[in-house]
């Protein structure tokens, strides 16, 4: 993944102590690099005729967390949510911050049912988190959208389905997993 990403002038690094991948973008290769790790996983799935799922997770009402409790609390929430996803993920899964309060998971060798089960475990783990702040207790929920690779897909196609299902999860009231 790192080698393929460097070809697009992007670097993916694992954050120390968190197990979470972060993206550092260089001018010029942003669009191609954004989907690079999904595309590498898709290429492997095509070669092996295996399964692949991409899950997008979004912290519900995150703007109001920042507005009400402050950006320090928002940072704490984001780190704790990311940590909960990393703990729930398998060692072979890629968990990356996708942007803002969105996280992306690439689950190689995982079909829709398995991805939905994992996302549900993650949703419950996030819902169980509690934060003590200067302005009182805080808890958050997370919405998940699951996209599954289908023969002939590319990385952006799988990601687009995950994004569409994340939007459906938000539209259906948040704090849920939508996989189909």
Feature-to-residue mapping (PLM):
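Conserved metal-coordinating catalytic motifs of nucleotidyl cyclase and c-di-GMP turnover enzymes
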Residues: 55-58, 100, 162
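Cell-envelope/extracellular polymer assembly enzymes that use nucleotide-activated donors
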Residues: 53, 143
């Amino acid at each position: 993944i790192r080698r393929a990403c460097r070809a697009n002038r992007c670097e993916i690094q694992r954050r120390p102590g968190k197990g979470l991948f972060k993206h550092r973008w260089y001018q010029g290769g942003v669009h191609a690099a954004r989907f690079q790790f999904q595309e590498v996983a898709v290429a492997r799935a095509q070669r092996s005729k295996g399964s692949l799922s991409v899950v997008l997770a979004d912290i519900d009402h995150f703007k109001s967390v920042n507005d009400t409790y402050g950006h320090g609390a928002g940072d704490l929430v984001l780190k704790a949510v990311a940590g909960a996803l990393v703990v729930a993920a398998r060692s072979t899964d890629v968990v990356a911050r996708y942007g803002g309060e969105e996280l992306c998971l690439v689950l190689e060798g995982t079909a829709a049912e398995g991805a939905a089960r994992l996302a549900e475990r993650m949703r419950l783990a996030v819902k169980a988190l509690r934060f003590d702040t200067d302005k009182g207790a805080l808890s958050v929920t997370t919405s998940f959208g699951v996209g599954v690779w289908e023969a002939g897909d590319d990385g952006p196609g799988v990601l687009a389905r995950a994004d569409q299902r994340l939007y459906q999860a938000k539209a259906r009231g948040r704090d849920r997993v939508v996989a189909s």
